[in-house]
């Protein structure tokens, strides 16, 4: 019931909301990395357990590079540690996002393709698809089950006055096991606390903060499409632009179904290297 009420509330709000870029944890909008810039980010997902489950910590690092104004690539490295169990490396991901349209429109599509070389101990939950995973399996067993997966997303994003509104539709295929196609979604809305600069140089001015909310979850698979045995989360998100290079993010996600974790706490720190591509080109005697 909570899930249905949240879905209805978000759908009712979307037509009335008014957009700007906001870095969500799960939802993607249409803004890509600036060409030649490299952003390095470390993020952590903390899973608060139900009775009989164990607390886990799932850190990951991401390296995002703006190849062109309409193409961004990212490499992810991830791990996981479970209380009373062990810490394991859970794999890597290589992601590419493409903007087919050069200009900005009322609705801006982005095409997303990702290859994942991970194992079943992965807990970063960068997306939620299919049915809810079994998080009670020991790391020694889960880490031995490897998966090669292809994930695609259709990202639709709009900027309306001071609001960003984004919708992601996810399809994932496990190439290692016959699980059919798995489906998921992510919806997000966000805005800055202030749109006009105060004129003062300060770290805590309102224009340095973006706030918003995400709703994301799984939609089953071709073997059984729908909400049965799926995880769904509603998550406020706050982003603090500390400087031109540094930003901090935080999001407490609330599980909406029994199959979800009761709470997911997410933290992120990112540092952006402006003009990284040009500097590397100069180092090797090439053109920036």
Q: Can you describe what each PLM-predicted range is?
A:
Residues 4-14:
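Bacterial N-terminal signal peptides
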Residues 19-288:
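Transmembrane beta-barrel domains of Gram-negative outer membranes and organellar outer membranes
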């Amino acid at each position: 019931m909570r899930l249905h009420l949240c879905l209805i509330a978000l759908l009712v709000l979307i037509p009335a909301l008014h957009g700007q870029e906001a870095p969500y944890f799960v939802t993607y909008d249409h803004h890509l990395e600036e060409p030649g810039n490299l952003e390095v980010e470390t993020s952590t997902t903390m899973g608060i357990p139900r009775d009989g489950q164990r607390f886990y910590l799932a850190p990951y690092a991401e390296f995002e590079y703006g190849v062109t104004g309409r193409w961004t690539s990212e490499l992810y490295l991830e791990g996981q540690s479970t209380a009373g169990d062990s810490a394991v490396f859970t794999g890597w991901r290589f992601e590419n996002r493409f903007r087919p349209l050069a200009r900005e429109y009322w609705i801006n599509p982005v095409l997303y393709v990702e290859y994942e070389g991970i194992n079943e101990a992965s807990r970063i939950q960068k997306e939620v698809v299919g049915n809810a995973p079994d998080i009670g399996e020991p790391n020694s067993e889960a880490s031995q089950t490897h998966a090669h997966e292809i994930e695609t997303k259709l990202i639709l994003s709009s900027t309306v006055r001071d609001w960003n509104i984004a919708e992601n539709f996810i399809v994932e295929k496990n190439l290692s096991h016959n699980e059919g196609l798995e489906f998921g979604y992510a919806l997000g809305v966000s805005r800055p606390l202030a749109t006009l600069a105060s004129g003062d140089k300060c770290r805590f001015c309102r224009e340095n903060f973006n706030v918003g909310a995400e709703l994301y979850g799984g939609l089953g698979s071709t073997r059984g499409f729908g909400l049965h045995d799926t995880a769904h989360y509603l998550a406020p998100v706050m982003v603090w632009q500390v400087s031109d290079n540094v930003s901090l993010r935080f999001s407490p996600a609330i599980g909406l179904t029994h199959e979800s974790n009761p709470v997911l706490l997410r933290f992120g720190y990112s540092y952006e290297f402006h003009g990284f591509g040009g500097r590397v080109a100069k180092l090797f005697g090439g053109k920036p």
